[in-house]
Structures are given as structure tokens and as C-alpha cells.
Amino acid sequence: MRILEIFAILLILKEVRPQTKRSHKVNMKTPFQKRKNHHLNTDSRATLMSPADLHSVEHSIVQIRDPTLIPHYDQKSQEDMKLHFLKNTLVTCNDGTTAGYYLRETKGSKRWIIFLEGGWCCYSKETCGVRYDNVKRLMSSSNWPQTRKGTGILSPRQDENPYWWNVNAVFVPYCSSDVWSGNVSKTQDGYAFMGSVIIQEVIRDLVPRGMKQAKSVILAGSSAGGTGVLINIDRVAALVEETTSESVQVRGLVDSGWFLDSRHSKQSDCLDISKCALTEAIKKGLKLWNGILPENCKQQFKKGDEWRCFYGPRLFTSMKSPIFVVQWLYDQEQLRIENIQTEFQSMTENQWNSIQNIGREFKKSLREVPAVFAPACLSHTLITKSNWLEFQVKSVTLAKALHCWDRSLQENRAPKGVIRGCPFHLVDNCQWPHCNPTCPAIYDATSGQELSILQMFLKLRLESQRRGQEPKGDLGPLMSMLRNSG
């Protein structure tokens, strides 16, 4: 019977696999795998993993799949975003160099997108030292390129970015290592943590460049930048309204920054973030950074528990500004925080079941959020990917959902005012990782070949049988879900 079952699966693969074909493949190998053949001190393209014994600290540092991180050496054009340093030179990166932003202005436009870069954080002398040695650009502006290309929602190309290609686009590089919350000019170890102040100064510098006449401002961010949006959006809204001459709508776009409380906890002193709870790193960091958190959120917790305001589900209930949450249901960073690896050759039964539980927890946490785009995929960050239009939930792209949300806010002035035929609360219904046929491709770590969801499951199942284990669930529901595409 077992042989017949496997044979049946292989027959079905011929039917299902074409659904996963795509013109642009997103490599899902871990950053560590990609980095094996590269020198560690490459600032222009930092990875999430660090060398040898400190690999897990560095793993937490930065996303590598953001094309805007690559210096652009072609002939300068009007499509490039150009570097501007802050006028207030006292507002600095970790190492004391002046912070700044990249700007592409569009004449006549009164719409603005301000994007906060991600890249995790450092929270002690040791972790900040590792970060500075390996990804200096996340702590210093000294080697920033003069221009960047905008991609995804920052792209000036209408075919790549149909609704926001002609807005004023701002990219704020992350060089404060404090999840955009810090407010200290120099610690005893010599580092500045001024993320929250940098955002405020960027807004002030943009006022004479046209923001004074703004009608719409979106504060967006990915990963740590997305968490930075959650933490800062209400203060940004107040500052924008104070400095603009007309009525302006300010809203937030949170990409892969909606983290859940980790179920893992370690009481011992933690220098390596993979060996301790995320909450321990945040607690340490909050003190080091003199972090500024929203007062409305802090009031919900007793003294000493303010760190809970770094988590989206905790923070959302006290927010005033409308936000749109973009969140992979099987976010790779959340899985890493939970000590779950996604290499199917070595995954255990418990890890497989834990991955499914994470998806259910994300769904539950997003129920009361009016504007959501949550595909059932294994990935991390989305809005600045050049192929962001490929991904869909219930046959709706993220760009379309954002446009519907934008229209709803303009026409109804209320976050729950849904326009008929224009949905913007989109959460996949299917129950398995990567059950959405538009998910980014997954590749076999050994062969490099792309895997369909059924091949992935079969690989896991065969490996589990070899170990005398069996992932819970049968293939019938999985096949049905694949045919219905969530």
C-alpha cells in the first residue's frame, strides 16, 4: 500500500506542478547557504547570517533580498533616488556619522511614500561589535552609495508599480540598530541609537521639499522597518499634520514586522539571539536604546513590561492611525525566532506541526485588523521585491488590495469602509505552508531543483518514515486545498 500511495502522489505531481511555474523564481535558500561562497565583509549586500560561532547573532541582522541595497553605478537618471544627509548633523547613525535618506521627487505629486529599511538590531556591546564588523552600512552612513534604484512599491516603472509609480518616494536607510525606537546620542560603549529621532528629522527635512502640500503620506517598512512603522506611525501622523498646510491622510504599511510573542524563553544572560527568547533581546535593547514607545500602548502594561509594545498584536489595539499589514503566514524570521528550521530534509515531526501552529496563530492575530494581505507561504518581506505583483491571495494582488484600501480611506474616511468588489482583508484559507500556488519558489538544498508543495511534503514524509516518525495529517485535504488554491 505504501508503494501505491507514493506512486499515486507522483502521478498527481504531473497535474499540480504546472501551477507552481512562474516567470520569475524567488530563491528560498537560507541566507547562510547563499553566503558560503562569499566573503563576510561585503557591505553592499549584507546577509542574515554571521560567521562560524557568531552565526546566529549575524543571522538576525539584515534581509538580503532587497534590490535597493545594491549600489547603482549606471548613468544617473531621474528614476534614481538620490542621497540627502539630514540638515541636523547631531542626528546620527550608530557610529556618529550623519543619518540621511534617499529621495525621488515627482513634480506635481502630493502623495508620499516614506520607507523604513529593515535589518534587525543589536542590543549589547558584543552584538553591536559583531554587527559593525560585518555589516557596517547598518551602523554608519560613511559608505552609502549616492543613488538607489526603487523596486516594488518604490519603483518608478508603471508596469512594476501600477498605483504608486508617480509618487514622491523616500527610502530611509537603517543605521540605528534599534528597531527605529532609539533616543540616545551616545551610550557608554560609544554608540548612538537615534532611530525614532531620525524619522522625525526626515519628516522635517522633507517639508520644504514639497511635503508641506502633501495630501497623502504612507509610512512603510519591512521587517524591523515594519515594526518601526507600528511604533512610530501615530507620532509621525501628528508631526505631518503639524507641519503641512493642508488636510493630509497619514497611514502605515507594515511588511513582515507583525511579530508574535515567542513561546521560547531563556532566563540566562543572552548574547546569541538564537539561544534566547526574542523578548530578552528586546528587553536588553530597550534599555540600551532609551527606546521610545507609544504612550497609549505603554499604559496597558505594568512598569517593566513596556517591551510588549514591540509586538504588533499588542500594539495595534491602542493605535489611532490606519495601517495595512502584509504578513506571510509562515514568516521565516518568526520561525527562526521559534527555533524552527525550514530545511525539509532534516525537519522533525514536531517542527512541521509547529510551523502549522504558527500559521494558525498569525491568522488569529490578524482577525481584527481591517486591512491585511497574508499569503500562506514560507518567506520574509514583500513590498520592495521587484516581482511583488506575482503574489496573490484569493486572486487579488497586494498592489490591488492596497489600492482598494487607499480608495476606501479616501472615499469613506473610515478604516472599515469596504468598496464593493475591492477587497483589502485577504488571508489565505488553506492550512499548509506554501499551499498558495503563487508562493515564492522553494528549492531543494541538495539538488537546487524547484519543489512543488506535494514534492516538498513527500520529501518530508519519506524522511520522517526513515526516522520512524510521521507528520500529522493525510494527503487528501492537502490535495483538495491545492486544487482550490486557498
UniProtKB/Swiss-Prot annotation:
Belongs to the pectinacetylesterase family. Notum subfamily. One of its GO terms (cellular component) is extracellular region. Its EC number is 3.1.1.98. This is Palmitoleoyl-protein carboxylesterase notum2. The keyword Glycoprotein applies. The active site is at S223, D331, H380. It holds the Pfam family PAE. Glycans are attached at N183. It comes from Xenopus laevis. It is found in: Secreted. One of its GO terms (biological process) is Wnt signaling pathway.
